[in-house]
């Protein structure tokens, strides 16, 4: 799985789209990065840009954008309603999928260092990327804004983490930049069956982390209680990492709870929704749906789908499409307008952009796939078919698990079978990927053979490319073997404890999985034969032989179980 991060740089220009277009063109020029949104603000004279991609590519795109902004924006002339201290005012990195905050911090600090050293721009690291606790808060780093920058740059306490520590002709033009690492922020509104902003605010105060001011006597009209420093004493709300207010939206004719979920690993979308439902019900108000503003990581939607299925005591071993559908319907995300997953889920947006114009075997229907296999084209071949057999084996195992989870009289065992279904589904997903991966590996070998070979240098480069491609084409079917064999554990469990009416389906799953193992191993052997590295080739063949023998034994064991029950 690819690591994905989001980057949300804020540029101190919101009126001249010619400048903004030049900055965003730098981002678009980096392969592997998707420009999600460009949001200029005239009053703030500021544009918020959102991009997503793999970490290295996003950092490269961010660097190029910061460089272009430093060339085009003159902070000496800047005026706007929003706090700012640089041409690129802030540049936070946000982990999206398959990457930790700790890794994101390292990328943020590396980006900050590069901006400071190569562009000679003062850089402050904030939030999780901060080197000291007092610099975690962006407002503290930006105190006094651009106008106070000259004094702060040379200050012992507030000099930048990277870049020049003086205000000269260049830094006076560029200002400073704050580079940070923060959690993904989800802007999320919950719809109410009321037009009352006051009642919506009451619910917002119930749930938001900050809560509401403590009062003497009457909780609504009583005098606000102050602490020894004269600040309001607050009664915390029920949800951590949540900011919320109530408002009335004239366009929809309803009041909403407008929330910023600042850390969805602490309070998820579905947890926030359910808590608002509870607090609204306490006040005689009904939640009718919700609205997602902006984009959301795939995991957040899948987690929501699983959460609502578990509440129903239903199996969660279903497709991503089904989980998203459950999430949308349960949260009422389609109440105000249709919810389009391909335009709202970050990974899907990036996937569609990266795969534009490409054709995939897994997108074909059964007739098309069979015809493509039967054609005179050498791919897809046995490797892709082996992977697909494994995918069908895990699909059958998952089907038996789901049928068992929902079997009448087995209600108390729903979670046991749901867990098996999730495992089976995970293998199916991986093996489906291997269908195209195997064909891609074959095509990579063909591309390597097509390289020029006129000079000695070209011949050497071509030979190395062939070796690299052949090694990759050996590793791909070996991964297929392992997935096929590992999924047999789910098949066996379903033969043993699953719905007895479906035991023969488990048997067919065993046959398909074993065939997937042996078929993939044939590809391992034929590709390994072309490797110069005989030690590696012999090792992978030896390991493959052991997997084949284990798969054959597992098939025998499963079929014995199946035959004993029919």
What are these regions (language model features)?
Residues 65, 369, 395-399, 441, ...:
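Amphipathic, well-ordered alpha-helical segments in soluble domains
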Residues 7-9, 85-92, 373-400, 501-520:
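Conserved phosphate/anionic-ligand binding catalytic regions in large, soluble enzymes, centered on
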Residues 111, 121-125, 134-138, 487, ...:
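Preference for long, well-ordered alpha-helical segments
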Residues 184-186, 438-511, 515, 527:
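Amphipathic alpha-helical interface segments
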Residues 356-365, 371, 479, 486, ...:
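Polytopic transmembrane helical bundles with strong interfacial aromatic enrichment
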Residues 406-452, 547-556:
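A structural-propensity feature for long, helix-poor, extended segments
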Residues 388-392, 420, 427-434, 473-483, ...:
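Amphipathic alpha-helix face/heptad-repeat signature
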Residues 1-368, 375, 453, 461:
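Long, contiguous binding/interaction regions
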């Amino acid at each position: 799985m690819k690591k994905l991060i989001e980057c949300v740089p804020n540029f101190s220009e919101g009126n001249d789209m010619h400048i903004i277009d030049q900055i965003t063109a730098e981002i678009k020029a980096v392969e592997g990065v998707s420009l999600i949104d460009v949001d200029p603000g005239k009053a703030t004279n500021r544009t918020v840009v959102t991009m997503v991609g793999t970490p290295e590519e996003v950092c490269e795109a961010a660097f190029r954008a910061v460089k272009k902004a430093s060339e085009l924006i003159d902070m000496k002339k800047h005026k706007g309603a929003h706090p700012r201290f640089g041409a690129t005012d802030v540049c936070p990195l946000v982990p999206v999928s398959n990457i930790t905050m700790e890794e994101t911090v390292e990328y943020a600090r590396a980006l900050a260092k590069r901006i400071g050293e190569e562009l000679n721009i003062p850089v402050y690291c904030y939030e999780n990327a901060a080197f000291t606790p007092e610099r975690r808060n962006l407002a503290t780093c930006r105190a006094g804004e651009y106008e106070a920058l000259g004094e702060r740059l040379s200050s012992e306490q507030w000099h930048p983490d990277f870049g020049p520590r003086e205000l000269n002709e260049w830094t006076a033009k560029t200002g400073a930049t704050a580079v940070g690492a923060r959690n993904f922020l989800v802007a999320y509104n919950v719809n109410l069956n009321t037009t009352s902003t006051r009642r919506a605010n009451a619910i917002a105060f119930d749930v938001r982390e900050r809560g509401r001011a403590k009062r003497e006597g009457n909780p609504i009209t009583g005098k606000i209680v102050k602490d020894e420093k004269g600040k309001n004493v607050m009664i915390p709300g029920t949800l951590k990492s949540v900011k919320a207010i109530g408002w009335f939206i004239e366009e929809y004719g309803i009041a909403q709870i407008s929330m910023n979920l600042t850390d969805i690993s602490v309070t998820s979308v579905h947890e926030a929704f359910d808590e608002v439902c509870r607090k609204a019900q306490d006040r005689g108000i009904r939640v009718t749906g919700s609205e997602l503003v902006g984009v959301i990581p795939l995991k957040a939607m899948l987690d929501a789908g699983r959460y609502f299925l578990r509440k129903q005591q239903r199996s969660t071993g279903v497709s991503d499409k089904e989980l998203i559908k459950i999430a949308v319907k349960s949260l009422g995300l389609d109440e105000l307008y249709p919810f389009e997953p391909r335009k709202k889920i970050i990974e899907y947006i990036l996937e569609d952009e990266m795969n534009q114009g490409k054709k995939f075997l897994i997108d074909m229907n059964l007739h098309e796939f069979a015809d493509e296999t039967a054609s005179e084209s050498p791919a897809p071949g046995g490797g892709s078919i082996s992977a697909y057999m494994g995918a069908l084996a895990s699909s059958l195992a998952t089907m038996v698990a789901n049928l068992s989870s929902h079997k009448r009289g087995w209600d108390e065992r729903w979670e046991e079978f749901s867990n098996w279904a999730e495992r089976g589904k995970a293998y199916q997903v991986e093996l489906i990927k291997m269908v195209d991966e195997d064909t891609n590996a074959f095509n990579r070998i063909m591309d390597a053979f097509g390289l020029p070979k006129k000079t000695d240098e070209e011949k050497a480069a071509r030979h190395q490319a062939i070796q690299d491609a052949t090694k990759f084409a050996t590793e791909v079917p070996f991964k297929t073997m392992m997935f096929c064999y590992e999924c047999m554990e789910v098949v066996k469990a379903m033969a043993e404890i699953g719905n007895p009416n479906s035991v023969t389906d488990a048997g067919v799953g065993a046959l398909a999985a074993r065939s997937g193992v042996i078929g993939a191993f044939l590809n391992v052997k034929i590709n390994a034969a072309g490797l110069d590295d005989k030690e590696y080739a012999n090792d992978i063949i030896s390991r493959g032989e052991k997997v084949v023998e284990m798969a054959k034994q597992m098939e025998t064991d499963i079929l014995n179980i199946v035959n004993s029950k029919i």
